[in-house]
A protein has these predicted regions:
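Conserved N-terminal beta1-alpha1 strand-loop-helix module at the mouth
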Residues: 1-126, 131-207
Length: 207
């Protein structure tokens, strides 16, 4: 089954939708250049209301280690690094927080994909650019065997195609479940339904 990550949770209504739809992951953005950024206090309140079956992920981009360790106190259970963080920094985050790390990479060309596979992290993510809402070139990922999150330009209309073509471990969505810059519960539900339909169709093909 393809895991789902709803990213950019900002409001109690977003948490209510997560608790109803049960994605495997919910992302909370701590990078202050993002319009989806929330404070540690806000994140702590939201995470407290999140069902335990949904893993809260803190999203960071080229931020100092103390910022990440402080945010770890909010209740996040994974760290997502979305910048130019190197292996040494990833290892320090894991050591200081005790949390698993998702390292995100921007898909530019075959070389960027190949280089990303040399990084040691708990999971990797391939994106078209942090929060850009633009789809990456999926053909560059067809030969990747490692489990990964697929992000960038996904919505209910194309996530099924992505799952059929690439079979990622997880799909990550933010702008694709928004209306007017806010999470839209109806779009969140349609996205989950599209993922589950694609999973079911894929399983039938394997039989």
């Amino acid at each position: 089954m393809t895991a789902v990550k709803f990213c950019g949770m900002m409001r109690p209504e977003d948490i209510e939708a997560c608790n109803r739809l049960r994605p495997e992951y919910a992302g909370f953005v701590f990078w202050d250049m993002s319009r989806r950024c929330i404070s540690r206090d806000e994140a702590g309140v939201l995470i407290t209301g999140l069902d335990r079956s949904v893993i809260p992920v803190g999203v960071f981009r080229d931020q100092p280690l103390p910022d990440i360790t402080a945010a770890a106190e909010t209740g996040i259970r994974m760290v997502q690094l979305h910048g130019s963080e190197d292996q040494e920094f990833i290892d320090r985050v894991k050591e200081r927080t005790g949390l698993p790390v998702i390292k995100a990479f921007t898909v530019r060309d075959a070389g960027s994909v190949r280089d990303s596979l040399g990084i040691r992290s708990d999971l990797i993510m391939f994106d078209s650019g942090a929060g850009s809402g633009v789809r990456s070139d999926w053909s560059l990922l067809r030969d990747v065997k490692e489990p990964y999150f697929l992000a960038g330009g996904l919505d209910a209309g194309n996530v099924g195609e992505a799952i059929k073509e690439l079979h990622p471990y997880a799909v990550d969505v933010s702008s694709g479940i928004e209306t007017g810059g806010r999470k839209d519960p109806a779009k969140m539900e349609r996205f989950m339904e599209a993922v589950r339909r694609a999973d079911l169709a894929y399983r039938k093909e394997e039989i």
